From Swiss-Prot:
Recorded superkingdom: Bacteria
Protein name, UniProt field: Uncharacterized protein SAOUHSC_02143
Entry GO MF terms: 6-phosphogluconolactonase activity
GO cellular component: cytosol
Covalent S-S links between cysteines: none
Database matches in SUPFAM superfamilies: Nitrous oxide reductase, N-terminal domain
Annotated source species: Staphylococcus aureus (strain NCTC 8325 / PS 47)
Family that this chain belongs to: Belongs to the cycloisomerase 2 family.
Length: 342
């Protein structure tokens, strides 16, 4: 049995963090329950037996740390709610486990926290930095919108996507906070959202929410150079849709991207050691608004959460040879589910 967690909005029926048990032998979820009620826990990241989730209480915003016990159940360690500038949308941990990074979409800011490397508790907010970059012309690009922050494969920087400014910004970081390093621009109105790095550290898959495209970019010392781009929806689709999550299979052979509105998952074959993509197919996600999904470590199953509609959690069997996915379970619900991790 594999334990997984789903983060959620708590605007309507969402409860916070859901815990589920994935039965990989039967290709289904045997149990899905409220793991811990945590307001606005829209993104999660795990460090072994510690789980971090975005959180807010009233006007105070930040991150909570929770201990994962031997049964996969969650117990609160502590909270660091040191800001009133807005709730985050993405969190990640530095390789040395000393820092936690947070991106805040609404306010266009990034945060950096100090962690206790022994207990996993959050010690303090080190810095909150506002983006001030020229924005695109799309109606949703009225100001900067930091959407993702994570350490680069070389370990030297953090890369931050800005959906409002159509770019990736890299920063040096230390105990004092962030220091601007470089920026990489994409097309106007792309709405740069997330990054998935190939294991070789040379190539990155940059997804753009507003243009519904994925860029293959060469990464070198804090800079991203676009090599090619691909639509993640059919060319003739004219409905309202926006790209969401991106994940590589663990064997690095296939890339998956979800589309909210078209309600699908696009599957690409990874070629030439990561520098090219080729569309395999686009498969229905089995629900409404597939905000996030993840792939079990075995590479056999893909689990997808849906923010809207019935908020069904779909499980797909994955063909490792073709990359294609087949729906095999849609019996569980995680209201307002927007993040899936194992």
């Amino acid at each position: 049995m594999t334990n997984g967690y789903i983060g959620s909005y708590t605007k309507k029926n969402g409860k916070g963090i859901y815990r589920f048990e994935l039965n990989e032998n039967q290709s289904r979820i045997d149990l899905l329950e409220t793991g811990f009620e945590l307001e606005a826990s829209t993104y999660l990241v795990r460090n072994n037996e510690v789980l971090y989730g975005i959180n807010k209480e009233g006007e105070q915003c930040g991150v909570a740390s929770l201990k994962i016990d031997d049964n996969g159940e969650l117990h609160l360690l502590n909270k660091c709610l040191s800001s009133k500038a807005g709730t985050g949308c993405y969190v990640s941990i530095s390789e040395d486990k000393r820092y936690l990074f947070e991106a805040v979409y609404g306010a266009g800011i990034i945060r950096m926290y100090e962690l206790n490397t022994h207990t996993g508790e959050i010690i303090r907010l080190i810095q909150e930095l506002a983006h001030d970059f020229p924005t695109g012309t799309h109606e949703r690009q009225d100001h900067p919108h930091a959407h993702y922050i994570n350490q680069t494969p070389d370990g030297k920087y953090v890369a931050v996507t800005d959906l409002g400014a159509d770019r990736i910004v890299t920063y040096k970081f230390d105990d004092n906070g962030f220091e601007f390093y470089k920026e990489s621009l994409f097309k106007d109105s792309d709405g740069t959202r997330h990054i998935e790095f190939h294991d070789n550290g040379k190539f990155a898959y940059v997804v753009h929410e507003l243009s519904n495209t994925v860029s293959v970019a060469e990464y070198n010392d804090g800079k991203f150079e676009e090599l090619e781009r691909h639509l993640t929806i059919p060319e003739n689709f004219d409905g309202d849709t926006k790209l969401a999550a991106v994940r590589l299979s663990h064997d690095q052979q296939f890339l998956y991207v979800s589309n909210r509105g078209h309600d699908s998952i696009a599957i690409f074959k990874v070629l030439d050691n990561g520098q090219h993509l080729e569309l395999v197919t686009i498969t229905e996600s089995g629900g409404q608004f597939p905000r996030d999904f993840n792939i079990a470590s075995s590479d056999d199953l893909l689990v997808c959460a849906h923010e809207q509609g019935d908020s069904v959690v779909t499980v797909f069997e994955r063909n490792k040879e073709t990359g294609k996915i087949t729906l095999c379970d849609n019996t569980r619900v995680a209201s307002e589910g927007v993040c899936v991790i194992f």
